[in-house]
């Protein structure tokens, strides 16, 4: 093995396998672009984003880690969300949960 070398199994890796997903239509009602990262608790995003906020509680964007989705002013788009995993506790972000989700 060469230092730093990766040994990866052949084939595709399925992200978030077996987790519940939900699609939502999201619109930016503000006058500035809003960018949401892959692991941000979607329920707590900028208030200028209009969508069914209650349906997004305990979920994040179903996109690869380290990436983001940008919502331009006046733009509406459909996004897919995926359940948060692990302990399902949320702290920080906009401070709207600060504890267990379930």
Curated annotation (Swiss-Prot):
UniProt keyword terms in alphabetical order: Cytoplasm, Hydrolase
Entry GO MF terms: urease activity
InterPro entries per the UniProt record, alphabetical: Urease_beta-like (IPR002019), Urease_betasu_sf (IPR036461), Urease_subunit (IPR050069)
GO CC annotation: urease complex
Similarity field: Belongs to the urease beta subunit family.
Predominant location: cytoplasm
Gene Ontology annotations of biological process type: urea catabolic process
HAMAP family: Urease_beta
Superkingdom: Bacteria
Enzyme Commission no: 3.5.1.5
Subunit-structure text: Heterotrimer of UreA (gamma), UreB (beta) and UreC (alpha) subunits. Three heterotrimers associate to form the active enzyme.
Species the sequence originates in: Pseudomonas syringae pv. tomato (strain ATCC BAA-871 / DC3000)
Locations listed in the record: Cytoplasm
Entry-linked CDD domains: Urease_beta (cd00407)
Listed name of the protein: Urease subunit beta
Pathway membership: Nitrogen metabolism; urea degradation; CO(2) and NH(3) from urea (urease route): step 1/1
Catalytic activity: urea + 2 H2O + H(+) = hydrogencarbonate + 2 NH4(+)
Gene that this polypeptide is encoded by: ureB
């Amino acid at each position: 093995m060469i230092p730093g070398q990766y040994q990866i199994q052949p084939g595709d890796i399925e992200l978030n396998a077996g987790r519940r997903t939900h699609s939502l239509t999201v619109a930016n009602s503000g006058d500035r672009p809003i960018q949401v990262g892959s692991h941000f608790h979607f329920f707590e995003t900028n208030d200028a984003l209009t969508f069914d906020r209650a349906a997004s509680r305990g979920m994040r964007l179903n996109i690869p880690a380290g990436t983001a989705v940008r919502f331009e002013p006046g733009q509406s788009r459909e996004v897919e969300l995926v359940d948060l995993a692990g302990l399902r506790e949320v702290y920080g972000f906009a401070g709207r949960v600060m504890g267990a989700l379930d």
